C-alpha cells in the first residue's frame, strides 16, 4: 500500500485541508442522510430557543452542547454505516451489530437531549 499523499503536511496547509474534508463530510451527510437533516432542523429550532429561555449561562451551554452531541453521534453513525456498506452489502450478523450499535448510540444521544432539556425546564 502506498503512503498517503496527505501525511506529513503541517501548518496552514494541513488545517485548510482538514477544514475542506470536514465541510465535505457535512455536505455528504446533509445530502445523503435524512436523519442528519432532521437533526440539523432540530438544532435550528432548539438552539435559538435555548437563547430565549430564562436559564443560567451554564444551563444554556449544556442545552446547546447536548444538541450538538446528537449531530456528532449521527455523523459517526453515518460513517459506520457507510464503511459497513463499502465492505459488503451482504447481510451479515456483524454488519447488523455495527449498524445497530451506531443506532443505539444515537438513541442514547437523543435521550440525553430529552432528559437534559426536561430537567432544566421542569427543574
UniProtKB/Swiss-Prot annotation:
Annotated binding of a divalent metal cation, by residue: 33, 81
Example of a GO biological process term: phosphatidic acid biosynthetic process
Keyword Transferase: yes
One GO MF term: ATP binding
Known cofactor(s): Mg(2+)
Enzyme class name: transferase
Active site per the UniProt annotation: 74 (proton acceptor)
Pfam hit, one: DAGK_prokar
Cellular location(s): Cell inner membrane
Keywords for this protein: ATP-binding, Cell inner membrane, Cell membrane, Kinase, Lipid biosynthesis, Lipid metabolism, Magnesium, Membrane, Metal-binding, Nucleotide-binding, Phospholipid biosynthesis, Phospholipid metabolism, Transferase, Transmembrane, Transmembrane helix
Topological relation to the membrane, as annotated: Multi-pass membrane protein
EC number(s) recorded for this UniProt protein: 2.7.1.107
Catalytic activity, as annotated: a 1,2-diacyl-sn-glycerol + ATP = a 1,2-diacyl-sn-glycero-3-phosphate + ADP + H(+)
Transmembrane segments: 15-32, 35-55, 61-81, 102-122
UniProt family annotation: Belongs to the bacterial diacylglycerol kinase family.
Entry-linked PANTHER family: DIACYLGLYCEROL KINASE (PTHR34299:SF1)
Job description of the protein: Catalyzes the ATP-dependent phosphorylation of sn-l,2-diacylglycerol (DAG) to phosphatidic acid. Involved in the recycling of diacylglycerol produced as a by-product during membrane-derived oligosaccharide (MDO) biosynthesis.
Name of the molecule in the record: Diacylglycerol kinase
Gene behind the chain: dgkA
Amino acid at each position: 500500500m502506498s503512503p498517503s499523499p496527505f501525511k506529513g503536511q503541517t501548518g496552514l496547509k494541513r488545517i485548510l485541508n482538514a477544514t475542506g474534508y470536514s465541510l465535505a463530510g457535512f455536505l455528504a451527510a446533509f445530502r445523503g442522510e435524512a436523519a442528519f437533516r432532521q437533526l440539523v432542523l432540530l438544532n435550528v429550532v432548539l438552539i435559538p430557543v435555548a437563547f430565549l429561555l430564562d436559564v443560567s449561562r451554564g444551563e444554556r451551554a449544556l442545552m446547546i452542547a447536548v444538541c450538538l452531541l446528537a449531530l456528532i453521534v449521527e455523523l459517526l453513525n453515518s460513517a459506520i454505516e457507510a464503511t459497513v456498506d463499502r465492505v459488503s452489502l451482504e447481510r451479515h450478523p456483524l454488519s447488523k451489530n455495527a449498524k445497530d450499535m451506531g443506532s443505539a448510540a444515537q438513541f442514547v444521544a437523543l435521550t440525553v437531549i430529552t432528559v437534559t432539556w426536561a430537567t432544566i425546564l421542569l427543574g
